[in-house]
Structures are given as structure tokens and as C-alpha cells.
Amino acid sequence: MALLEFQGVCKIYNNTTKALADIAFSVDEGEFVSIIGPSGSGKSTILRCINRLVDATQGTVIFDESDISHASKKDIREARKKIGMIFQHYNLVDRLSVIENVLHGRLGHKSTISGMMGRYTESEKEKAFQILEKLGLVEQAYKRCDELSGGQKQRVGIARSIMQEPKLILCDEPIASLDPSSAKVIMDHLSNINRNMKITCILNLHQVDVALKYASRIIGLTSGRIVYDGPPNHLTKNKIYEIYQSSEGELITDVW
């Protein structure tokens, strides 16, 4: 069953720059999809159209059977409760502790006052610690986030996302700021979350080798258009060159 559908989506910035052109695809529940393409190809714009950080100029985005491209602010807030977001630069509150940042994943489910006062239930706190334990961070729970390494910060971002209990997790270049060893840890965690928790994942990646190893499906973008949509084992060197105008060897980042 399709969890997400793009139907003829276009996005034009400032009435001149076409970021997306007639994008059409669907994502079923449980898929692990990697979107690849050079900088400026439209990868981030696709994710932003899903969670309505930007509005599509034309076309329709359906998420969980609801048209979110034309939704009210209230309906957008409801949709965002089901969509976790993991950012390249973590988007954490550095002065707060790890556990506080993870609990922020529940803010969308609380009133403004409860959120501001940090009113979390004991079951929510217990769940946050369980998630941190699975991600190997429980010993860091009371550390400020600005004391963590980049890989640890990204795991906090993953934990916060899981805390939302999302149907979909969007990852915008989640390993771009990490060394190869930390990148592998992050990708392994995301893969395990997808398999074991049955959460659909869509990742924007520059690293072709990472997409080939982890994704069940790859979407290739060039100049705002889809030029490949299929399984990793059908992605040929010629198609990679078409996507990037570069050879496969130049796009390898050893994270095995």
C-alpha cells in the first residue's frame, strides 16, 4: 500500500528556478529509498515538499491517504506528527542534554504549555531511555549535546525521530558531515530501524556506494527530473554517469 505519492509535482523558486519538474512516484510502507543526484538536482526540495517546509508550485503530494500539498495548517501539523526528520547538521539544541533533545520528539503530541514546561510522562521518559540504549547512547543521556561527536549527535537525531513514533523518516544527507566509520554506524542504525520497526525511510545521499549497499530502491535525479527509479542492482554505470555526469569511481566513499 502506498504511504506516499507524488503526482506531477513541480517546484519553481522565485518564478525562475525550476527545482522539480513533473515528479511522479509512490513509496510503499516499509521501503528504504535512497534519492541520489548532484547538488541542486532537487533532492532536498522533494523532502521539503513532503513535510511542507516548501509548497509545491504544481501537482499533488499524498501522504498516508491525505493530500498534504493543499492541506490546512492544522492538517499539516497532524501529518508532521507522523514524519520524522533527520538533518545533515543534526538540528539539536546544543545547550540541552541528550535525553531532553530526544524527548523533544514528543512535542508535536503535546500542548504548547506542556511542551514549554517540559511535561513528559514517565512512560515517555522510559521509552526515551530505551531508544538511547538501542542506539548505544544511554551513558550519554545527561551530557549536553555540544559535548558529543558528530556521529553521536546524529544518533541523538535518530532517537528524537523515533520518539515521534513516525510512519516515515526523512533523512537529508544524514552522513555528509561524518567520517566513514561514523557514517557506517548511522546507516546500520537506519537500516535496522527500517527492518525491525517497519518504518519507511527516504534518504537523500551523495554517496552512490552507500545507496547501493543499503537501499531497497534508488531514485536518481538530474536537474529536477527523475532519470532512474528502480532496484540498486539495475543501476548501471552508464545511468550513474547520466545522473552525475561523472564516473562511478569518483563518487565512492568507503564506508563498508
Segments from the language model and where they lie:
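Conserved ABC ATPase signature
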Residues: 144-148, 152
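The feature captures the beta-strand-to-loop junction immediately N-terminal to the Walker
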Residues: 36-38
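Helix-to-loop junction immediately C-terminal to a conserved catalytic motif
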Residues: 51
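Conserved ABC ATPase "signature" region
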Residues: 67, 114-139
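Helix N-cap at the start of a conserved alpha-helix in ABC-type nucleotide-binding domains
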Residues: 180-182
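Conserved catalytic motifs of ABC-family nucleotide-binding domains
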Residues: 165
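Catalytic Walker B motif of ABC-type/P-loop ATPase nucleotide-binding domains
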Residues: 169-172
